[in-house]
Curated annotation (Swiss-Prot):
It comes from the Bacteria. One of its GO terms (cellular component) is cytosol. Belongs to the NAD-dependent glycerol-3-phosphate dehydrogenase family. This is Glycerol-3-phosphate dehydrogenase [NAD(P)+]. Sn-glycerol 3-phosphate binds at K109, G137, K192, D245, S255, R256, N257. Catalyzes the reduction of the glycolytic intermediate dihydroxyacetone phosphate (DHAP) to sn-glycerol 3-phosphate (G3P), the key precursor for phospholipid synthesis. PANTHER family: GLYCEROL-3-PHOSPHATE DEHYDROGENASE, GLYCEROL-3-PHOSPHATE DEHYDROGENASE [NAD(+)] 2, CHLOROPLASTIC. The keyword Zinc does not apply. Its EC number is 1.1.1.94. One of its GO terms (biological process) is glycerophospholipid biosynthetic process. It is found in: Cytoplasm.
Amino acid sequence: MATKLKVAVLGGGSFGTAIANIIACNQHQVYLWMRSGEQATASQLARENTRYLPGYRLHDDLMISADLAQAVRGAQLVFVSIPSHSFRAVVREARAYLDPGAMVISTAKGIEPEGFTLMSQILEQELPGHSIGVLSGPNFAKEIVQQQQTGSVIASESDALISCVQKTLCSSTFRVYANHDRYGVELGGALKNIYAIICGMAAALGAGHNTQAMLLTRSLAEMGRFAQLMGANPMTFLGLAGVGDLILTCTSDLSRNYRVGFALGQGKALDEIVANLGQVAEGVNTLRQVKQKADELGVYMPLVSGLYAVLFQGKAIHEVAARLMMGEQNHDVEFIKNRS
């Protein structure tokens, strides 16, 4: 290792813990910040995140603390792994301790509850002058700490940030690819949570492989259509942060959003499901935000509209599914159709 860095990871959830552990294994000085002092002390002593990643021993050199100043001061890299509803508040709190040259990376896959603001846009607003990046991809935290081979994407306008993150996280089991389409990478991570709910619901209702394949590919088409109108590169959605994350999240019960959909398909109430989940499922809030924005832009997103009708308008799942099958039959691969 050429240079030993100080790195802060803000957020004691499963993904923040997994990323911090990789960095500690790579012999950097890393602090994992948890809001709860009790949880931080227990995790530091047990060398285990008993709440979100029970059963997995953390590296002995990983420092776990509830002292935000201690974690952030002097850090060259700061990863923010905070749910969207409290992301801005934590960034504002950390701002006073950031070094002027610190590079800040969001790992959150959501949209701020009020207004269509992505997490890296919050970083830009709250931390002017800092290099900003997004880390996203098909990355279940449990499989990362199990040292399953995993690929992720770091997206930024800054080549220096991209290079630094790649070097800091690279290991024999974790590979980081580069992308300059930060907006597209971040949208992919947020949008796929909606479709994970849909696919989980379909699985609970006994959907066959044909149905699952159709849902996945039409989900990808909707994501690309929406993102292109929002200014992202639709080709980004053919990579790890797009179709890769979509496949992972829509086919596994390790996904919180998939589990929400599965429970909905079993007839359970949304409020009960969210209360019993124990962790944040970003897809429910993202659905509200994307439905509103799609209506404003006039984007054709039948799957988003259908799920919204089920969750918030009291429509029956079978009624919505039947309507979707009788809807507009459009082109299959739209970004190819539109090329001159």
